[in-house]
């Protein structure tokens, strides 16, 4: 698979990173909010709840949280083992690496900049006077939007669908994995594993390189 340029699109929460960003944010609200949001996240990622509806409910729980708290929570986000190796090795081989997330630009922008991702897309939190309103600003990045992002980026860069790779763990990654030339389930829920061409059960994101024939640097 190394002869032609590839597009590798990564989910963020629990794939590119070890954490669910919205769960980290909820801890800054209250213990009760943290438990509620974490439970909804688990059900949504297992494909047992509609993602858009579940995200709307979880974001409502963040109303009143300050943007300073968002910055503080972002500082606690942990990259997955092997994430930097995956990104840098793929780019060194001439491939593009992107991220698309049902999480938030406010948390993902610094991560994308630090890693040097070629493209990224996520939801935006609405804020007023420095406080979150509990709403999303703009369209929700759901399963359909993830699939659309993969296809749009591939078309923009003249990359054939067969040369696209999608990596994710949750139910909202299924459409993206199914649309990619190679769909990789990484430490994934059962619903995601069933849709994948490749399953990685070891917590090392650089193993994606081995599956798509890209050398490590």
Spans of features found by a protein language model:
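Alpha-helical substrate-recognition element adjacent to the catalytic core
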Residues: 1-125, 203
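C-terminal cap/substrate-recognition subdomain and adjoining C-terminal extension
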Residues: 74-217
């Amino acid at each position: 698979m190394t002869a032609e340029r590839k597009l590798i699109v990564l989910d963020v929460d629990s794939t590119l990173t070890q954490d669910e960003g919205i769960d980290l944010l909820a801890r800054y609200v209250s213990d009760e909010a943290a438990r509620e949001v974490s439970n909804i996240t688990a059900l949504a990622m297992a494909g047992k709840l509609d993602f858009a509806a579940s995200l709307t409910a979880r974001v409502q729980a963040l109303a009143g949280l300050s943007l300073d708290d968002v910055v503080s929570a972002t500082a606690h986000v942990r990259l997955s083992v092997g994430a930097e190796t995956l990104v840098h090795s793929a780019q060194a081989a001439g491939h593009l690496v992107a991220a698309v997330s049902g999480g938030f630009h406010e948390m993902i922008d610094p991560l994308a900049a630090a890693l040097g991702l070629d493209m990224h897309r996520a939801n935006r939190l609405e804020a007023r006077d420095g406080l979150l309103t509990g709403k999303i600003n703009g369209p929700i990045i759901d399963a359909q939007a993830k699939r659309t992002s993969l296809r749009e980026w591939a078309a923009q860069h003249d990359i054939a669908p067969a040369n696209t790779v999608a990596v994710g763990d949750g139910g909202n990654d299924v459409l993206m994995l199914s649309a990619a030339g190679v769909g990789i389930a990484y430490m994934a829920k059962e619903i995601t594993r069933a849709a994948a061409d490749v399953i990685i059960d070891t917590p090392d994101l650089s193993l994606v390189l081995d599956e798509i024939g890209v050398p490590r640097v």
